UniProtKB/Swiss-Prot annotation:
Annotated Basic and acidic residues bias: 176-185
Protein name (record): Doublesex and mab-3 related transcription factor 3
Entry's family note: Belongs to the DMRT family.
SUPFAM superfamilies given in the database record: Cysteine-rich DNA binding domain, (DM domain) (SSF82927), UBA-like (SSF46934)
Domain DMA, residue spans: 255-290
Biological process terms in GO annotation: adult walking behavior; male sex differentiation; regulation of odontogenesis of dentin-containing tooth; regulation of transcription by RNA polymerase II; transmission of nerve impulse; ventral spinal cord interneuron specification
Functional summary from the UniProt entry: Probable transcription factor that plays a role in configuring the spinal circuits controlling stride in vertebrates. Involved in neuronal specification within a specific subdivision of spinal cord neurons and in the development of a coordinated locomotor network controlling limb movements. May regulate transcription during sexual development.
Keywords: Developmental protein, Differentiation, DNA-binding, Metal-binding, Nucleus, Sexual differentiation, Transcription, Transcription regulation, Zinc
Subcellular location: Nucleus
Length: 476
């Protein structure tokens, strides 16, 4: 029994040691082996001493390599034909003259194959130009950008990648070499464009690379560089989760995203578009999705001012931060991280509410889920007459608060007095004190600025509640 394992099973005695698997064979250079030299093949082909040898054994190796190349080309062609058989009959067209790329590929394959391989294998029929066009009609081809990647259309492996792999097909469609540009300007290619049957309405036109642009569901698409560019095909309809938007094809890839948004949404203010684009991190697609999803909630903008947070006409608190935002919070996406809650909408009409700088609604037409507290920094105030203390003001807007106190004109407001005094309880408020609406003012090292008191001490009354709760009695 040898050390590499025996191919036979001996029945006589027990096996002394388990059979060992043979080691993996490392490929060697066949030309060097013909001349008695052992050379590993990896990285050796360029530096082989016998690469130009014309002896009988080396010529046999050359013929064998040509046969293998012809077999690989035949397998690729069969794979392409099996892919083309999956194309529906509505996308098939009349056969036309082969494009220059396929003609060059066929000539290159024929020149590489040996006479022995040509006799053993049938000749490959030339593929019509419309087969590639019909296969490419199944997807939308992006705008070509010459010079990004020098693609060789004459190579058969690139043709296989176009039909098989969609990602590499898009990259090949975006890049064309100078040679292909000259071929596209020839009259033969112009003749090959008019080889579609009139009974296939899905195919609109063929662009310069031999691709067909498909019309999906009545949405006309056209390539901006095509000479057959019509006015009725100048827009691409993009369907979002809640609406559609018309994207003009005249937009170039090197335009800034803000200019693209201005072209798509001309009714929106440029400042709003800029803020949404910054909120999406400069991503144009995310900004378009946010603006599309905001259209579905446009009907919610008809709510009255009593159900919203109202800023007075002389309000200056949110001027420099929220001055560019849209008035209604329903313009924001439902899934956006920058969404303003539905109960916080800013309006210039403050005639029907208490003229406090902060007015919080306590009644809604339907129960809403609990929200996280809204932190308002005191750095938003500009003048010294602001009722905010130097501490943070935490505004709690919970579901329990809305259900327990069904009020119409009672609003919670911060008041700059000491932390032990509270307001006299309103006759409308219930006597339950466990879940009162409160504004907690944590005293965490910031000095309290003494301000002139608006109310007298007779208007206040101590009540069994936490020391940091304050309720404004507007009915007294």
């Amino acid at each position: 029994m040898n050390g590499y394992g025996s191919p036979y099973l001996y029945m006589g005695g027990p096996v002394s040691q388990p059979p060992r698997a043979p080691l993996q064979r490392t490929p060697k250079c066949a030309r060097c082996r013909n001349h008695g030299v052992l050379s590993w093949l990896k990285g050796h082909k360029r530096y082989c001493r016998f690469k130009d040898c014309t002896c009988e054994k080396c010529i046999l190796i050359i013929e064998r390599q040509r046969v293998m190349a012809a077999q690989v080309a035949l397998r690729r062609q069969q794979a392409n034909e099996s892919l083309e058989s999956l194309i529906p009959d509505s996308l098939r067209a009349l056969p036309g003259p082969p494009p220059p790329g396929d003609a060059a590929a066929t000539a290159a394959t024929a020149s590489q194959s040996s006479p022995a391989s040509q006799a053993s294998q049938p000749p490959a029929p030339p593929r019509p130009a419309t087969e590639l066009a019909a296969a490419a009609a199944l997807r939308w081809v992006a705008e070509p950008q010459p010079g990004t990647l020098p693609a060789q259309i004459a190579k058969p492996d690139l043709t296989e990648d176009r039909l098989g792999d969609s990602s590499s097909a898009d990259n090949a469609a975006e890049s064309f070499s100078d040679k292909d540009t000259d071929q596209r300007s020839s009259p033969d290619v112009v003749k090959s464009k008019n080889c579609f049957t009139p009974e296939s309405p899905e195919i609109v036109s063929v662009d310069e690379g031999g691709y067909a642009v498909q019309k999906n569901g009545g949405n006309p698409e056209s390539c901006p560089d095509s000479p057959k560019y019509h006015a009725e095909q100048s827009h691409l309809l993009i369907e979002g989760p809640s609406g559609t938007v018309s994207l003009p094809f005249s937009l170039k890839a090197n335009r800034p995203p803000l200019e693209v948004l201005k072209k798509i949404f001309p009714n929106q203010k440029p400042t709003v578009l800029e803020l949404i684009l910054k909120g999406c991190g400069g991503d144009l697609v995310s900004a378009v999705e946010v603006l599309l999803s905001s259209r579905s909630s446009a009907a919610g903008a008809e709510r009255t001012a009593e159900e919203s947070l109202v800023l007075p006409s002389s309000g200056h608190i949110f001027e420099h931060t929220l001055g560019s935002y849209p008035i209604s919070s329903s313009k924001w996406s439902v899934g956006s991280a920058f969404r303003v809650p539905d109960t916080l909408r800013f309006s210039a009409d403050s005639s029907n509410v208490v003229p406090n700088p902060l007015a919080v609604p306590l009644q809604h037409p339907f129960p809403q889920p609990p929200r996280y507290p809204l932190m308002l920094r005191n750095t938003l105030a500009r003048n010294q007459s602001s009722p905010f203390l130097p501490n943070d003001v935490t505004l709690w807007n919970t579901m329990t608060l809305q259900q327990q106190y069904q009020l119409r004109s009672q609003y919670v407001s911060p008041f700059p007095s000491n932390s032990t005094s509270v307001f006299r309880s309103s006759p409308v408020l219930s006597s339950r004190t466990t879940e009162d609406p409160r504004i907690s003012i944590p005293d965490d090292g910031c000095p309290i600025v003494a301000k002139q008191s608006i109310y007298t001490e007779d208007d206040y009354d101590e009540r069994s509640d936490s020391s940091d709760s304050r309720i404004l009695n507007t009915s007294s």
